[in-house]
Amino acid sequence: MDLEKFFDTVDHNKLISILNKEIKDGKVLSLIRKFLVSGVMVGEHMEETEIGTPQGGNLSPLLANIILNELDWELEKRKLKFVRYADDCIILVRSQKAAQRVMDSITKYIESKLLLKVNRKKSKIGRPIEIKYLGSTFYNQFKAKKYKAKAHEK
């Protein structure tokens, strides 16, 4: 599953509401909000950021992971097997029908609850012979029902 321009589209209010569940110190939340709107350099001038996490910011990967942790909990609640690293996610199911059902319902969850956009063109459903994920390719060996990994060549 692919999230469209993930780091650039994180909704600040949604992220702060998630953080507010665990962080009770308003000063910390205020500091995080200031970080989120601190802006980016475009050429020679600064532009304030209304959405997204500042690219290259030290907190950006952590804050992105916090919002996607909500997705992890939803997938676990549904007892789905998945692997996620940052905004790269693979969800494993047993059938094509289940895959379509999960894709539709998880897309709805991501877009309505997390206020993120799923890239439908890059998100795929299928029975893979090989899976490319995070720089490795996993090949299905049908007889043994195991996967072997091989690093991508750049």
Locations of the language-model features?
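Conserved polymerase palm-domain catalytic core
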Residues: 1-130, 136
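Active-site and adjacent loop segments of nucleotide-processing enzymes
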Residues: 136-154
